[in-house]
Amino acid sequence: MSRILDNEIMGDEELVERTLRPQYLREYIGQDKVKDQLQIFIEAAKMRDEALDHVLLFGPPGLGKTTMAFVIANELGVNLKQTSGPVIEKAGDLVAILNELEPGDVLFIDEIHRLPMSVEEVLYSAMEDFYIDIMIGAGEGSRSVHLELPPFTLIGATTRAGMLSNPLRARFGITGHMEYYAHAGLTEIVERTADIFEMEITHEAASELALRSRGTPRIANRLLKRVRDFAQIMGNGVIDDIITDKALTMLDVDHEGLDYVDQKILRTMIEMYSGGPVGLGTLSVNIAEERETVEDMYEPYLIQKGFIMRTRSGRVATAKAYEHLGYEYSEK
C-alpha cells in the first residue's frame, strides 16, 4: 500500500495537479524568491525578444517544479514540450525532440539527473550554441551532420541536484531552489484547492491540514481528498478542525506531519541506539527499508523539522525527537 505522506506522484494525481495548476506567476502561491527572480528574467528576455536563459529547478518532490515550468512557458507565451530523463534512453531520442522545437520554445526535462551521459553530452552544444553534431550511419560510411537549432529554453527539474555533472550544471543560467512551504502558504493552497473542487472547509481545518502536510502541496492536496471522505461519511460534509484531526489521526499522520515510518525511524534510533549516532545503512536494515528510500523520502523532512541531525559519526536523534515521542532526554 502506498504511503499517504509519500511526496512522489500517485494514481490520478497528475490529472488533479493539471486541474489545479496556476497559469501565471501572480497566481502561483509560495516560492516567492524563485518567483521574484523569474519575473525579472522573463520580462527582460521578452523585452530583448530573446529566449530565456536555461533554468534549473531543484528541491524535494511535490513542491511545484513541473507547475513552475508550465508557468514560465505561459509567461513567455511559447509552447512547452515535456519529457523526462528516464524516457530519453539514447542520443537519437533527444535529437528528435530538439528537432521539433520552434524559436523560443521551452523544453522541460523532469528528473534531468537521470539522463544517460551519452544524451547529456549532446545537450552541451545544444544549450550553449544551439546546434548539435550527430553521426549518421556506422563504420567507414558514417558521417557527421551539423544541425542548427532555434534558440530555446531548457528547464531541468531534479530532486538530486548533487547528481548533475558539473558541465551540465554550468550551462544553466538561472537556478531556482524550491523549498518546503511555510504554514501560511500551504494553508492558502488547501483553501484554493477546496474552492476549485467545491469543498466546504473552515479556515481552522485548512490550517490544521497544512500543519500536518510536511510543507508539501502534493501531500496537502492528497490529505484534503481523504479528509473530505471522512467529512462525508462521519460528518455533514463540512471539513472542520474536529473531523480533520480525527481523520488524520486515523490515517496515522500526527501533529508534526510524521507517520508510522517516521516514528519507527526515531524510535529505532532512541530505543536500540540510545539516540545515536547510527549509520544510515544500519538504520535502514533495522526498519526494513532501502537505504536510498530512507535518505531520499524520510530523512530530509526529519532533518528539516529538527528531529534528526547528521554528524560525521552518523545520524543522531535530537531532544525534540525524544520529547515528541514521549521519551526522557538526557544530555550525553
UniProtKB/Swiss-Prot annotation:
Tell me which GO cellular component terms the UniProt record holds: cytoplasm; Holliday junction resolvase complex
Region (Large ATPase domain (RuvB-L)) residue ranges read 1-181
What catalytic activity is recorded? ATP + H2O = ADP + phosphate + H(+)
Recorded hits in Gene3D superfamilies, A to Z, give:
1.10.8.60, P-loop containing nucleotide triphosphate hydrolases, Winged helix-like DNA-binding domain superfamily/Winged helix DNA-binding domain
The record's EC number reads 3.6.4.-
Citing just one GO molecular function, the answer is: ATP binding
Q: What is its main location?
A: cytoplasm
- CDD domains on file: AAA (cd00009)
Q: State if Ribosomal protein is listed as a keyword.
A: no
Q: Where in the cell is it found?
A: Cytoplasm
Q: Which domain of life is it from?
A: Bacteria
Reply yes or no: does the keyword Heme apply: no
The record's section on SMART domains has: AAA
Where do the annotations place Mg(2+) binding?
A: T66
Q: List the disulfide bonds.
A: none
Q: Which UniProt keywords apply?
A: ATP-binding, Cytoplasm, DNA damage, DNA recombination, DNA repair, DNA-binding, Hydrolase, Nucleotide-binding
Small ATPAse domain (RuvB-S), as annotated region: 182-252
What the entry lists under Pfam families is as follows: AAA_lid_4, RuvB_C, RuvB_N
Sites binding ATP sit at L20, R21, G62, K65, T66, T67, E128, D129, F130, R171, Y181, R218
Coiled-coil annotation: which residues? none
Q: Looking at the record, which segments are called Head domain (RuvB-H)?
A: 255-332
Quaternary assembly: Homohexamer. Forms an RuvA(8)-RuvB(12)-Holliday junction (HJ) complex. HJ DNA is sandwiched between 2 RuvA tetramers; dsDNA enters through RuvA and exits via RuvB. An RuvB hexamer assembles on each DNA strand where it exits the tetramer. Each RuvB hexamer is contacted by two RuvA subunits (via domain III) on 2 adjacent RuvB subunits; this complex drives branch migration. In the full resolvosome a probable DNA-RuvA(4)-RuvB(12)-RuvC(2) complex forms which resolves the HJ.
**UniProt free text on domains:** Has 3 domains, the large (RuvB-L) and small ATPase (RuvB-S) domains and the C-terminal head (RuvB-H) domain. The head domain binds DNA, while the ATPase domains jointly bind ATP, ADP or are empty depending on the state of the subunit in the translocation cycle. During a single DNA translocation step the structure of each domain remains the same, but their relative positions change.
Q: Which family does it belong to?
A: Belongs to the RuvB family.
Question: This protein is called what?
Answer: Holliday junction branch migration complex subunit RuvB
Q: Which organism does this sequence originate in?
A: Streptococcus pneumoniae (strain JJA)
Gene assigned in the entry:
ruvB
